[in-house]
Amino acid sequence: MWNNLVAAPVARFARRDGDDFRLPLGSAHLATATPQGFRETMGATIATSLKMPPGEAAFFANRLLVFFSSCDARRFGQWEHMSWRDFVHGHKRSHEFRALLSRTLTSLLVAAKEDMASARTIGNMGEQFLGNPLEIGNDGDLDRVLNGPTNDVWIDPWVALLRGLGVRFEIGAEVRGLEVRDKRISGARIVDGAGTARTVEADHFVVALPAERARTLWSPAIREIRPELAAMDELYTDWMNGIQFYLRTSPDIVAGHAAFIDSPWALTSISQNQLWTRKLPEFGDGTVADCLSVDISNWNTPGILYGKPAKECTPDEIARESWAQITTHLNDRGEVLREADLHSWFLDPGISWQAEQRRNANADPLLINTAGSWDSRPRSHGALENLFLAGDYVRTNIDLATMEGASESARGAVNALLDVTGSGAPRCRTFTLYRSPELEPLRQMDADRYARGEPNLFDADI
């Protein structure tokens, strides 16, 4: 898969009835060795790139400095329990500040409202995103995507590799429960695709399920042995699903991701043909020239066509509403997307319209890192010796519902299993997130200040 990742070199931030701006995502060289240098350089970059008033840009840069210079104890003890909006004082700032630096950051990263998302999670990710273009703490470009259809260039080769290693997939089987005996999992109750129930016995069990599915398996017996798993009931999920628009032409939008800042549904997109090795006209009957793949991050806010949130729209209404919100951003300075160019669309099959309830159901919700949710997240391994957890809800350094977070949790589960069995096999390589060494003295100072109950050195309005 690694060789099938390609860089998306530019991001576009589109405004409705306003000037868009494009942000190159290549390497940069910013003089940030000192706190003052960081504030000035980052503030100027934000003011220039986002057309933000210099005073507000400087204020946001200072909030980043507060977080980056915070010790671990403060990050977990203070910022984890604060929303991103409160951390950046979004309720006190201008509309532009709230739209770009408070609301958009959280909706794009974690599909959450800025008054819900943990400041620690958003700050951690901001720390990585800013380090990447400086070519520190990263192993590639800031924004990378697959160079072809996900199944073709990732899932199918991965499945073939695993099968070659002896893995057997039981497609259509559902886990209904876990049996406990002598403080160990003795079996998993499953129902196969034919409706036949049976119990699978094994030496070890790895539960690699999303949080909302995994917690249904935690019986009273399991919760008695691992009481911390009961806290998973407090974990919050919301929706972040997509729709694909197949086009007869390849519109010139941007060579990477586009964010539609003023869209009620917090839409983002990417035009895939420009990044794929095998071009779209080579698929099907050749009439499709491009695919505009769109993420819908806000399913709770009414749209501009029907006055309904996406959760209450039929599939056809979702398509029309998403298209309308995108075109109002792209066509306000000239026609970029034309109705005549739309060949067809395809909605995420995880979204299903429930006619009687007049709303959608979602088979694939997204874990949201709400303020304080770290305390409700378990580790990969605990008191049940042969039970191991893998999923983006497990405590990880990445700390975000992403493939990278899930991968890190899986590495932790495998390493724990190898430790329990006393295996001499090599352990999975693990990683830590980047932190600027230049700010380490400030973080050590902050540890002393936090222990004394004092605020961060830079935690003041400017």
List where the protein language model places each region.
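Short, hydrophobic/aromatic-rich segments at coil-to-beta transitions
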Residues: 183-189
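C-terminal segments that line or cap access tunnels to active or ligand-binding sites in enzymes
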Residues: 82, 134-146, 189, 202-204, ...
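Core beta-strand elements of the Rossmann-like FAD/NAD(P) dinucleotide-binding domain
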Residues: 194-204
